[in-house]
From Swiss-Prot:
Pfam families: DUF134
Matching PANTHER family: PTHR37478, UPF0251 PROTEIN TK0562
Natural source organism: Desulfitobacterium hafniense (strain DSM 10664 / DCB-2)
Name of the featured protein: UPF0251 protein Dhaf_1981
Family: Belongs to the UPF0251 family.
Cross-referenced InterPro entries: RNA_pol_sigma_r3/r4-like, UPF0251, WH-like_DNA-bd_sf
Intrachain disulfide bonds: none
């Protein structure tokens, strides 16, 4: 029997989920898809300055898992920048942290409001 899925904890969704060249009407061959959990590792490690160990604790996964996610995220980011492809952030194996009782205790709800992060899961209106 396979191990049950361990969801990766994400503080907030990106305000914009599509980045790329302004002069390109990109089809699928000109897109790079980054998952929300890959985006979260870039945010925590590169923007917030956390170590991979600290990032792993925040996302509720092993450090080796974060390392793999981070490597893939950086490859996708580089491919988008170097090859002029649109970066589309969507999907992944994640759950939004509510920042409340069962949350991380790091004030995710307050941070989402301050940063303007979306608190809606994909498909919600």
């Amino acid at each position: 029997m396979p191990r049950p899925m361990k969801w990766r904890k994400v503080c907030c969704l990106p305000e914009s989920n599509r980045f790329g060249p302004l002069d390109l009407n990109a089809g699928d061959q000109y897109q790079v898809k980054m998952t929300v959990d890959e985006y979260e590792t870039i945010r925590l490690i590169d923007l917030e300055g956390f170590t991979q160990e600290e990032c792993a604790k925040k996302m509720n996964v092993a450090r080796t898992t974060v390392q793999g996610i981070y490597i893939e995220a950086r490859k996708k980011l580089a491919e988008s920048l170097v090859n002029g492809k649109v970066l589309q952030i969507e999907g992944g194996e994640y759950r939004l942290c509510d920042g409340l009782g069962n949350g991380c205790g790091q004030g995710c709800y307050k941070r989402r409001r301050r940063m303007g992060c979306s608190g809606k899961e994909e498909g919600e209106d």
